[in-house]
């Protein structure tokens, strides 16, 4: 799918319609080190700056533990996080709430506010969780849209070979959980185990049909999925936790900028899983576009808050 028209001159427009704020301290914006972290962190930076907020750029600060530690210690003021990670932050992995988008969001929002004085703003309607992606030609020919469809296809004897990491193949909450929920079982001849956990490698293997592979371990919003001709399968039974990205801001900072939630809400609301977020990730991971420039490919200027 072609990305919607690049909005041009929207920052200039926003500069006119947005009143600069005369607030105390600059807002320190951080993110995780991965592609999507860079993208979302830069989007937050852009929205705040378009409303006259002075910022400090700490995008791509580090891994989840590093960034999480930075915001709880006050080193960061705002960063994008995933709702499902609340299960691990608060050691509550068995609560079924994490497998429901709204329940998981409300739970992590409540816990973080109470324990850390962190406020979760409106999340994007996307899910960056473990999934299986199949080649689009296979998906279209066999009407594969969900993991339930995959279970049906495999029972019918459909040709299938999955590229995945050993962790995905072996972890009880990964492939085995999908097999149990959707009533299928892959044998060794249907699996290609690749070293590490890099989905870029598994997706590339499926795109190039390496060793007969036509499917790959992936994350729901992986950029290369659509760009390399693959399609993610939905998880209608909610086997995996929902990992919806959302801005997380320190309570004291939100008091200084009470409109921050209103500014960011329409932007994150526009980041739907397949039409926008995958394509924006692809513009970085596949096209090599700088994350700062990829921000400008958001669908419409009016969505910039």
Task: Explain the meaning of each model-derived region.
Residues 26-44, 59-63, 167-170:
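Extracytoplasmic "Venus flytrap"
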Residues 156-235:
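Ligand-binding pocket segment of bilobal, Venus flytrap-like solute-binding proteins
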Residues 90-100, 105-121, 185, 210-212, ...:
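Ligand-binding "clamshell"
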